[in-house]
C-alpha cells in the first residue's frame, strides 16, 4: 500500500448531534462529501466545511399535510387475497386478512367493477362484476353462487397509507413516536404540479446544497407487511405498487387494449423476476419507464436550473427508472448511488451508462440492528469490502460512502479504524485503474428472459439477500462480477429478433430452474430461438448450463439443451431407458484449481444423468454434478449449481475457457498454455 495520504471520493453521514464526530471522521477518512439520512438532519455548522453537501430528497413523502388534503392521490398497490375454497352456499373472501392495516387501506373510492377482479383459480377465468358484491363494512367480497369446491381470489387496489420504507425504518429502529409518512402519487395531476413547486421551494431554501440525492423518485418496489409488522412480500424489481386508475387509463390509451388486474397480479406471483414475463407486463414496464423518466427529466431540469447536481439512489422508489433500460439516458440524472451488498450489486451500479459518476454505499448501515452491544460491524464491513473489491477491479465505482447514524458507529473504534483502511485502499485502487480498460479473456452472454434491463440483478429477490433456493445460481453472477470477461445480458427476445446478436458472444450461460424466466420456459418452443442457440454452439461457441438450463418439457426433452450439454434430467419419463455412462474424469482442465478436484455445488440438482459421449467430471450417487460435451465445433459444460467461492470462481473461469476453446485455433490456445 502506498503510504502517501490520499483524500476524497468518500461520503459520510451526519446529524445534528454529531458535528464534532463528523469533522473528526472527515479528516480521518478523507471524506469530501457529507449527507443527511432518513431520520437525521443536516447541521448548520457543517454547511461551510468545503465538503460537498448531499441533501436526501423525498419526492413522494415527508409532506403529510398534502397527502391528507388529497387522499385521492395517495399511492396505491395491487394486492391479491388468499385463495378461498367454495363449499356450499355463498363464499365470503376477506380482503385484509394477513395484511397490515397500518400500511394498507382498501381503495373502494374508485370503480371497483373496473379496477378489481375476482378470479376462479380452478378455471383461470375472471368472474363478471355482476357475479360478486362488496361488503364495505366487513371489507370482504361476497360471491353468492360460486362453483362448489372451486378456489377463488380477489385482486384489488389498496392505498399505501404508510410509506413501506418509512415503516421498515420505524420497525427496525423501534421508532414509536413518529408520524406515519403517507406516500403521494407524483404521477397524478394535482400532485405532479405541487411536487415541482415543492422542489423549487426546497432548492431556494437550501442554497448550501450541492447535490440533491433523490431517494428516489415515484414508485417503490413491491414491499408489503403483515398484521404483525413482519415483511410479507418483497420484490426489489416489483411494479405492483406503481399503479392507480389514472396511470392505468393512460396505459390503456397507449397500449390499445383494456387493462386487467391480472396483468399485474399474475396468479399471485406479481411478475417476480422468476416468472416468464407476459407481453402485457412487458408493455406495462415499457410504458412506465417512458412516463417515469419523462417526469424525472422535469425534476432534474429544475435541479440543474439551480446549479446543482441530481443524484438518484438505486433503490426504494426507483421502479420505472430501470437504469439499464432504453430510456434512462434521457432522464438527466447526473449520478447514481446504490447499496453495495456484494460484487454483483456493485456492478449493478458501476456498469450503469450515461451518468457522470457512480457511488457505492457500503455496509453496514449505521443502524441499531448491527451497531449494538455484542454486534460485530467490523466483520460485516470486511465481508462487504472484500466481496465488492473484486468487482471494483473490473469496473470501479467513482466514490464510496456510508449511511445511517454516525454516533452509533463512533462507539466502535475498531470499526472506524477498519473503514479508514477501506477508504485509503479504495482511493489507491481507483487511482490505478480508472480510465483503463481491463483485459477481457472472453465475451460472455448471460441468456434469460429479461436481458440487459435486469443486468447484474439476476436471481435477486431482495437486494443482495441470501435465499437457499437461489444462492447456487446467484453465485454464477457473483463470480462473473469480478472475472476477466466482457459480460453482457441477452434476452430470448433479442435472439428471436436478431440471431446475429450472438455473433458478439464467445460463451453463453443459461442458469436457473426449469420454466423460470432465467432458463426460458416456453421460449424453447420457438424453433427460431432454439435453432439459433444450437447453431451458435455448433459453429464453435461455448455454452454453460447451470441447474436446469433450458428446462421445459417439450417434444421428448426436459432439458431443451440436452443435446448441447450432453445431460438430461430424469423426471420419470425416461426411467425405462437404462443408463451406463457413469465414469468420472476428475483429472480435467476445469477442476485443476479446485482442492481435491472437487467442487461445492450448493443445493445442486437431483436426477441428472449423462447421455452417451458425455464426459462426466463429477457425479454423486449416480447424479451428474459436472459434465463436458462436444457439440459440433463447440462445447457445452453442465454444472448442477455454483455458489460463490474462490474455488468455484476458478472452476467457472476454466469452464468458460474450455467451452469456447475449440474454435479459437492453436495460436490462441497456446496463449493459455500456462493454465492448461
Q: Where on the chain are the PLM-derived regions?
A:
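Noncatalytic N-terminal accessory/assembly modules of large enzymes
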Residues: 2-61, 65-100
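Hydrophobic targeting/anchoring helices
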Residues: 46, 66-67, 199-200, 210-217, ...
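A short, well-structured beta->alpha microelement
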Residues: 10-23, 38-41, 312-321, 477-501
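The substrate-binding groove and active-site-proximal loops of carbohydrate-active enzymes
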Residues: 8-15, 30-37, 172-193, 276-293, ...
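Short, Gly/Ser/Thr-enriched beta-strand-loop segments that form substrate-interacting elements
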Residues: 610-623
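Polysaccharide-binding and catalytic clefts of secreted carbohydrate-active enzymes
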Residues: 72-330, 348, 434
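A glycine-rich, often tryptophan-bearing local segment used as a flexible ligand/cofactor-contacting loop or short
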Residues: 519-597
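Catalytic domains of carbohydrate-active enzymes, especially glycoside hydrolases
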Residues: 11, 17-54, 198-215, 335-336, ...
